[in-house]
Amino acid sequence: MNKLLGLSLVATTLIAASLIADKTFADQTVQGSSATVAVNGTLGADNTNPDSKIPEGDDNWINVTVPTSTIFYNTPKDATVKSPTYNIVNNSGRPVDVSVTAFTADSANVAPNDFSLTLQTVGTASNIATTAMTKLVDAGAVTTSLNVKLITLANKEGKMTSTGVATTGNNASTFTYGGSSDTKTMTQLKYNLGLTFKSVAW
């Protein structure tokens, strides 16, 4: 009998609709009683376009695709935890840092004392994960105070900087779950995985 355990994926971003100013600024020195200041606004700025006039480092750049839910499992004959492979894809015009900042258990969970769970992150050959393995559960207990950078994803064109070389695939990473438990009784567990995204200026 398989043990099927589910996770919800909670992605945290700062999203706002706003009038966004030009990302370049200059000062003028006034020696008189008046001044004229140019006002340049963008309505509906496209955060997938690298040339959009969104200030550098602004989280309005963030446009990332993640799964809404994930699963892991094992069987009575094999203690090793397995899972499908899931994708994180950066669709935006700027690179994005991806971090795991929360992992919480459902109040009804009764996890076995020998249960361990890890998050395994994989980038590409030219953009390896910052943290390849993150411990989520150890001896049945959830890891608290998580703040682990997993990877920096290139922008949708595969570029890390404005003058950098575009490398196909560097805007995406994959993740799976690992771990183990020797329990022979089917046990349903539910958790929430919290991811946080940060726009990277160039």
Where on the chain are the PLM-derived regions?
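Short, polar/proline-rich extracytoplasmic segments that appear immediately after membrane translocation
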Residues: 20-87, 92, 183-202
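Sec-dependent N-terminal signal peptides of Gram-positive bacterial secreted proteins and lipoproteins
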Residues: 1-25
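Short beta-strand segments enriched in hydrophobic/aromatic residues
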Residues: 102-104, 179, 199
